[in-house]
């Protein structure tokens, strides 16, 4: 993560599916390609939904901490 600057942080603690992914999508729409978003979540569904979202939308999941909540995801905007 040395060269990856976090440009935005999105706290979705307490929110449940589908809200975290909807908020990630909304935030990424307003970002430039290559910018990094740190997502903090405690919904177990995000361990499946956020990696799936990144793959489907062609963003890069740079790093994920999914061992126990709060989960953290570093998402770099693609395209």
Curated annotation (Swiss-Prot):
It is found in: Cytoplasm. Sulfur carrier protein which probably makes part of a sulfur-relay system. The gene is tusA. InterPro entries: Sulphur_carrier_TusA, TusA-like, TusA-like_sf. The keyword Cytoplasm applies. CDD domains: SirA. Gene3D superfamilies: TusA-like domain. Belongs to the sulfur carrier protein TusA family. It comes from Actinobacillus succinogenes (strain ATCC 55618 / DSM 22257 / CCUG 43843 / 130Z). Pfam families: TusA. The active site is at 17 (cysteine persulfide intermediate). One of its GO terms (molecular function) is sulfur carrier activity. Keywords: Cytoplasm. GO terms for biological process: tRNA wobble position uridine thiolation. One of its GO terms (cellular component) is cytoplasm. This is Sulfur carrier protein TusA. SUPFAM superfamilies: SirA-like.
């Amino acid at each position: 993560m040395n060269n990856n600057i976090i440009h935005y942080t999105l706290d979705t603690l307490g929110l449940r599916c589908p809200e975290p992914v909807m908020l990630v999508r909304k935030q990424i729409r307003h970002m430039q390609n290559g910018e990094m978003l740190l997502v903090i979540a405690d919904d177990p569904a995000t361990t499946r939904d956020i990696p799936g979202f990144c793959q489907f939308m062609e963003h890069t999941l740079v790093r994920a901490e999914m061992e126990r909540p709060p989960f953290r995801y570093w998402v770099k905007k693609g395209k």
